[in-house]
């Protein structure tokens, strides 16, 4: 994907690079039959993750810089977007002085981090952990960032220790949206289509999935506060879901491949531009096409509260619940669940190129 994107091709055109690269590899460079899973995940995952990497790297790079500033920016950009760095090296852009692109920065950009303690209920192997949650929001659909793919996107990740380091990665970008109201209205609505990547790894769910979604984003003025909601329908071309604790002798895997769909609802409350409360619920149904199970039902609930303390600092707590119900031909397994709570210190930074911008951004799953 980046081979195309970093050389001037559009989002959709670069997606053909990812598809053709995967197809050539699957059909001509392996001694096994082409894998549908590899085609889907390489193409769609390459598009989602590639576009986010491309836009973040463009923000980091400065084509007018020189000296140590230029070196460190080029190095950071290469870490975020290695293929884009190879393209810049081949063109001589790493050392050339020329104007930055007009769309180097989005209209707004925000970064948030939660550092604290996590307790996992039930029979978790490591119930008590340090945890770090990171999220970034690029663009604002209520400021018109809805016309090109990923003009607005959101990313989030959870890192924990001791134990498995990564327990969550979520990436979500609006492909195209339409404003249904005027900018001056007290209640505003944006409808749109998005592309997503989801990865969860906990006691109840080990899931990786590419997804498309359609929904309505709404923003409400409530006195000095503001609220935002997101109601979404999900379509999942293919998900990988761990359904057994052992390798299936027929597939050699402990996870199954399954397409599916679902719904998600979220709400957030803001004081100024700072989120102070959030809650979300989602449910997904999948039908196994390759694996030991017959179907799966995955659910989640998350709730968070943050209290600003001073400046960029705040404190907060959260509760999460995850569930997986898997059915199998020939035997029964009970529903698996995990609940957890967190206490943390929050640090939030934001910047906007729009005068007077302080409105809440897109609600997104945390």
Question: Residues of each region from the PLM?
Answer:
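Transmembrane beta-strands of outer-membrane beta-barrel pores
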Residues: 115-121, 159-163, 195-201, 233-239, ...
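Residues on the lipid-exposed face of transmembrane beta-strands in outer-membrane beta-barrel proteins
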Residues: 3, 48-52, 132-140, 171-182, ...
